[in-house]
Amino acid sequence: MATSSVRSVRVSRAGELWSFMVIGALCTAAYAILYTLLRHGGLTPGSANALSLAATMGANFAANRRFTFNAAGEPLGRQLASYAVAYLIGLAVSSVALALLESALGHPNGALDTLAGVTAGLGATVVRYLLMRAWVFRSAVDALQGGTVAEPRMSPPRRAERARPGTMSVRWPRPELVVLLLLAAVLNLWALSQNGWANEYYSAAVRSMSTSWHNFLYDSFDPSGLMTVDKPPLSLWVQALSVRAFGFHPLSILVPQALMGMATVGLVYDLVRRRFGRVAGFVGGLVLALTPIAVAMSRHNNPDELLVLLCTAALWFTARALEDGRTRWIVWAGVMVGLAFETKMLVALMVVPGIVLAWLWVAPRGRLAAARQLLAGGAAMVAVGGAWPLLMTLTPAGDRPWISGTSDNSIWSLIFGYNGLGRIDGQAGGPGGGGGPGGGGGGGGGFFGGSTGVGRLFNNALGGQAGWLLGVALVGGAGILVASRLRRSDARSGWLIATGGAFLTTAIAFSFAKGIFHPYYVSLLAPFVAALIGATAGHALSGERTARIVGALALVGGMFTELLVLHNLPGQFGWLRPLLIVGTLIGALVVLAATAPRVRAAILAAAMFLLLLAPASWAVQTLGHATSGTFPAGGPASVAMGGPGGGPGGFGAGRGGFGGPPGASSSQRGGFAPPSGTGSQGGFAPPSGSASQGGFAPPTGSGSQGGVAPPTGAGGGGGPFGSDGSSLTAIAKYVQAHGGGTIGVSSQQGAASSIIASGMKVAGLGGFSGRESEVSVKWLAAQVRAGHIRWILADSGGGLGQDGRVGSSKLMAAVEQACTKVPSSAYSSSSATATAGTLYDCLGKADALTVLSSN
C-alpha cells in the first residue's frame, strides 16, 4: 500500500512538472516576443524585462492554477496575492540575473541580447515554480499527495492506464531531459543561418557529392570526381543526404550538425543517469550543453560533431553491456567505433582502451566469456570501420578519385599518415590556418594548439574551449574510482574505467601530439569531461563521508583549473576571480561538513553555478557572431576570430594555381622561397621569416594579408584568389567557350567558393591547401586521356610543395613541356585577371605527358 502511494505521488509530480513545463514554454515564447519588440522599441533591458513578465503573469497564473496544481477550488484572492509576491521575487531574480549576464557578455545587442533576456526569464520561471509549489498552491499539493484530489488534467496517464490491453505503452520524457534538449536546441539553432557555409571546404564537397552517387560513394571533393576529401565520408554523407532532401542551402548542412549536438547531450545525460541518478545525469548534460567548443561545433559542418556523437554512443552501449553482460551491447559499441572511424579515422580509437579495460576488468560473465565478447565487438568494429577503406583499395585507381592527402594514392597512407600517426609525431603535412567567410578568421589558435605538455589543455587557445572544469572531472573521477576500490562487484568501477579511460587517453594524446593540432579538436574531450563531472555531482550527493570529501576536493580542483584558464585569458572575467575563490572554498567546506542532504545539495548547486558562469558565458557569446571558416572556436568574437584572416574561402596559400616551374625565384609568380629567404606573393616564409601576401608567417610572428597570426593575434585579409573567385570565373568563361572541361588548380580550399557558387568543374590537385597531395604525371596523363581534365592553371602561391617537392616540380615541368600555354589576353584584358596565373590546355597531350612521366 505504501509503495502504491509513493508511486502515485511520483506520477503526480511527473505530471505536474510536465504541465508546468508546457505552460512555461508557451509563456516564455510570449515573453521572448514581447521582450524583443520592447527592446527594439527603445526600452532598456530592465524595463523590457519587467513589462514582459507582467504581461505574461496573468496567463501563467491562471493556467498553472487550473491545470498544473488543480487548485481551482481554493480561495482566489489569497492565491493571487501570494502569486504576486512570488512574481516580485521572480522579477528581482531575473533582473539581477539579467544585469549579471549583460555585464558578462559585454552589453551585447541583437540576438545575443535577446537570449540574455530569455535566460533571465527562465531563471525567474524556476524560482516561481518552487514558490508556487511550496507556498502559493501548498494546500493543493498536499491534498494531491494525500490522495484526496484528482490528478491534474494535463498530467500523463498512469502506468496502469498506459498498459491496458490493446493500447500502446507510452513513456513520457523525463522533464530534466526535456529541459536539457531545449537548452541545447536554443544554443545550437539560434541564429544558425549567420554561419553561412561554415567550412567552405566541406560545403563544396557536399555539393559535389549530392549531385552524383559516384562522387557520394567515393568521397569526391570536386564535381568531376578527381580528388577525394582528406577525411572519410560518413559525416559528409549525412550532409549530402540532407541536401538531396531539402536542397543545397547552408541550413541543410548545419541543422543535422545541430541535431547531433542535441543527441550527444541526451546521450551524456542517460550515460550518467544509468549509474549515478537523474540529478547527476542532468549535471552532466548541462555541462556539455554549456561547453563553448561543443556549442561551436554543433553550429559548424566539420566532421567532429558526428565523431563526438558516435564515441559517446560507444560509451553508452558499453555502459548498457556492463549492466547485464549481453554480447549485443558490446557489439553495438564496436559498430559505433567503426562508424566513428569512418568519420575521422584513427582518432576514433581513443575510446577503445578504456572500453577494453573496463570489460575485461568487470567481466560480467567471466574473463573467458569477456574475451570472446570483445572479439565479437572488435570484429564488428573492423567490419564497419574497414568497409570504405576496403572499397577504395579494391576499386581500380582509374575508376575512383585520387586520395587527397597522399602522394601514392593509397587509402592506408591517409589512415596511418596524414590522418593518423603523422598527427602525433608531427610528420603529417597540412595547412596552418585559413580564412573564414565574411572576413572572419579561422579560429583562435592559428597554426597549432600551443606548446605540447600537461598545460596545453589550459592555454589561451584550448583552455577557453573545454578546459574550465577539467579539475572537477580529474579529481572527481579519481575520487570515485578510489571509493569504489575497483571492486568488480561495484557497478561504478567499469563505468569509471570506460569513461575515465576515454578521457585520459584523449587528454594525453592531445596534450603531447606534435603534429598539426587545432583548438576545435578538444570537442572530443567535452562529453567525457561532462560525464565525469555529472558522476562527481551524483557521488557527492550520496551522503557518505568519503563522497563529501570527493565532492569538496573536486570543487577545489575545478576552481584551480578555472583560475588557470582565466590566467591565460587576460582581460576575461576579472570580476569573477575573487568571487570564484571565496565562493568555491566556502562551498567546499560546507559540502564537507554538512550532513543535511538539502543543505549539501543547495551548496553544491551554488558552487557549480559559480564554476559554470564563465564557460556558460562563452557558450552564449558563441551565438553572437558567425562560427565559420576552417577552424571554428567558441567564445566571444575577439577569440573566435583570432586566427588567420580571409575573405570568403580565402586561404594564405594564394590563389589556387600550381607553383611555378623549377628554377623560378621566390619573387616570381608561383615560385618557392629558398630556405633562408622571405616569402613573397605565393611564396612560403622560412621559420624565421615573415610572410607577405599569400605567405605563411612563423608561429611567433604576425600575419599580413593571408598570413597566419599567432594564437592570440588578429587575422588579416586572406589570399587574393579566395576573396571572390572573380579571376577564376573569367578563366572559366574562356574554358566554357572553348570546349569546356575541368580546370586543375592546386588548392581545394581555393576552389571551394567557386564550386559552392556555381558547381564549377574545378579540381584542387594539391589537396586541401595545395601542399598535401602529389599527383603523379602518369595519373594526370591518364585523366587527360580519359577526358576527365583538360586545363591546368599554374598560379602564384599554389603551394604544391612548401619545400619544393620533386613531385610537384616534376608535374609542373611536364605540364609546361607537354601542354599549350594560353595567353592571358585570350581570356581577359584586365590586369587583375591576367595575374591570376598561367592557363595550360592539355587537350590531346596525354601521350606527351605519358612519355614525360617515364623520364
Predicted feature residues:
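Membrane-interfacial entry segments at the cytosolic side of transmembrane helices
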Residues: 366-379, 544-551, 573-581, 593-609
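Luminal/periplasmic acceptor-recognition loop/helix of membrane-associated glycosyltransferases
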Residues: 717-752, 758-803
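Membrane-embedded alpha-helical segments of integral membrane proteins
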Residues: 133, 329, 333-334, 339-340, ...
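Transmembrane-lumen/periplasm boundary regions of multi-pass, lipid-linked membrane glycan transferases
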Residues: 199-215, 223, 352-483, 561-569, ...
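Membrane-integral, polyisoprenol-dependent glycosyltransferases
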Residues: 153-428, 439-548, 557, 621, ...
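Membrane-interface starts of transmembrane alpha-helices
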Residues: 15, 43-55, 108-123, 172-176, ...
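Alpha-helical transmembrane segments of multipass membrane proteins
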Residues: 27-31, 35, 56, 60, ...
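Juxtamembrane helix-capping/reentrant segments at transmembrane boundaries
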Residues: 71-90
